[in-house]
Amino acid sequence: MNRLFGRGKPKEPGPSLNDCIAGVDARATNIEEKISNLEAELRKYREQMSKMREGPAKNSVKQKALRVLKQKKAYEQQAESLRNQSFNMEQANYAAQSLKDTQATVAAMKDGVKQMKTEYKKINIDQIEDIQDDMADMFEQADEVQEALGRTYGMPEVDDDDLQAELDALGDEIALDDDTSYLDDVVKAPEAPSREPGADSIVPGKSTIETDEFGLPKIPTSLKTT
């Protein structure tokens, strides 16, 4: 049958929603341009009537202005209708796109869960627990090695009371070192002599022993002759 009558042409896909929106917006833009031109024509007629006196000429211009105004109103209704159509189609397009995005999200989530299940099958929980136990044993052995290396030998045991007594004694020694009162006698200045060296005069209140020019006691004469 196909050979006798031939195959029908494949049906072409209809315009998409975006194409319809673009077409309606273009028609609305064209009508709005016509409205703008009619407004300019109305301003021209209004200026003419403002400069004319009442009479047949002014009435003729007025009729033209009324005709242009009717056209403007008709175009405004068409433009509003087209804008409403475009808005409704945009809302429908947004809803359709949201559904597509939702489907894509769900498909991606399903694929992710499938991959997670596949990877989870490759994991052996018992093997992981064995590894953790082995690591714990190795850390414990490492601690034992460190403790053995840091062990000391030949050190006598010291009582805590003895250590405390030695610490208290050390504090007393430090306090004694800080006491400088024993230096007072050393740094004290000597008194000035009460008389000049070699003088024989006796100062009241002082010793009566005679001294020589060096301040030393003189040897009695009787002892010299002996």
UniProtKB/Swiss-Prot annotation:
GO biological process: endosome transport via multivesicular body sorting pathway; late endosome to vacuole transport via multivesicular body sorting pathway; protein transport; symbiont entry into host cell; vesicle budding from membrane
Keywords of the record: Coiled coil, Endosome, Membrane, Phosphoprotein, Protein transport, Transport
Recorded coiled-coil stretches: 21-93
Main localization of the protein described in the UniProt heading: membrane
Biased composition, class Basic and acidic residues, residue ranges: 188-198
Organism superkingdom: Eukaryota
Localization (cell): Endosome membrane
Annotated signal peptide: none
Modified residues (Phosphothreonine): 226
Disruption phenotype: Homozygous lethal. RNAi-mediated knockdown in ovarian follicle epithelium results in cell proliferation in the germarium epithelium. Stalks between adjacent egg chambers/ follicles become elongated due to increased number of cells and the linear arrangement of germline cysts is also disturbed.
Region (Disordered): 188-226
General function of this protein: Probable peripherally associated component of the endosomal sorting required for transport complex III (ESCRT-III) which is involved in multivesicular bodies (MVBs) formation and sorting of endosomal cargo proteins into MVBs. MVBs contain intraluminal vesicles (ILVs) that are generated by invagination and scission from the limiting membrane of the endosome and are delivered to lysosomes enabling degradation of membrane proteins. Specifically down-regulates Notch signaling activity in the germarium, probably by facilitating Notch endocytosis.
Record note on quaternary structure: Probable peripherally associated component of the endosomal sorting required for transport complex III (ESCRT-III).
Family designation: Belongs to the SNF7 family.
UniProt name for this protein: Charged multivesicular body protein 5
Taxonomic lineage of the native organism: Eukaryota, Metazoa, Ecdysozoa, Arthropoda, Hexapoda
GN (gene name): Vps60
